[in-house]
Amino acid sequence: MTTGQFVLQIVGITEAQLLSRPSLKYPDVDGLSDIKILKDNREMVAHTPSHDCDGLAETGLEILVAPCPPDEYDDDVLEAMNGETFTHTIFLTILREINEHKNDPKPPKPPKPVKYKKSNDPLVIEESGSDLSDDDDDNEQFIAINPKIAIEVMESAIEKHLMEKLPPVKQFKRNIEIKLEGKVDSTFSFVGFCTDGVPFIMEVNNVPFAEYTHGSRVRTDKSFYSKTAYFPGKNCTNTAEMIKKIKDLTTIKTESVTRCLLAYVVERTDIDRLEFSAYNNEYRRAVRRAVEHGVEIVPLVISWTKEGVAIYVTDKLPVVYPAL
């Protein structure tokens, strides 16, 4: 897997400003916002499937939107619009952090630590470690907050064989319902067969959330790139549905040879670990049990550009497992 590999591109992406969430025209519809397209100052109502997204989709923020007609999952929003419709959807939000001390004089760096190794030659000295980022630059992140985009990203990642925990795939389909009478009844993101003949099931989650201090981790240095990515968000409204899928996935794993995976598409690069949300102990417990029974966690980190291009970064982000 090569860092920097192209994954996909959102067609028609353009800059906008989020004027009001929820929309002033539809104040009771959480999935709609008022936005302004910056290139021509057009104002319109846009679909906002991420809702507030732990502060990443709030009034006043810069965002990236694209034309996106409604699909079958937007029926509730369309019904609330009383026959009207939307033409654009919010896909990414723009996060900027300014390093106010980047031009300050810096003290001299201490010498690098050294380690010794024995070889056929006389004892030699070998430098170890590498310089850590000093956060000299500002932090600018284009973060995919539309939960639907994680499925598109993962589909491309599967096709390009970007994940070590999932061998090359021979065939697969999206949104497959699996029923085992009295045991399992869930629709999973992907179901298919690997080239080694072993079936796999994957449930995909979108992870735009991150904090400097999360759970038991307290940061004082707050390097821009030391945040903890977490899932689910603080205001999660579908915990029961997600836990049911995790339990069903766990059941399938315990009763078959199927590769069962929980995938987390981390939509930003200013993080150094993934943790299951300290704001949702029910979800944490379900994940812990799943992992204990052999379900695998796949953390896929994606970097986005202003042009809506998704770039593969890594599938080896350290994961903090629940310890409840």
Labelled PLM ranges:
Residues 8-23:
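Structural detector for short beta-strands of small beta-barrel domains
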Residues 23, 97-103, 141-148, 163-217, ...:
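Active-site metal-binding core of divalent-cation-utilizing nuclease and nuclease-like domains
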Residues 41-56:
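Beta-strand/loop nucleic-acid-binding surfaces
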Residues 268-324:
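Domain-level recognition of nuclease-like catalytic cores that cleave nucleotide substrates
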Residues 102-129, 133-181:
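Acidic-basic catalytic patches of nuclease active cores, encompassing PD-(D/E)XK
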Residues 204, 210-211, 216-281, 301-303:
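Nucleic-acid nuclease catalytic cores
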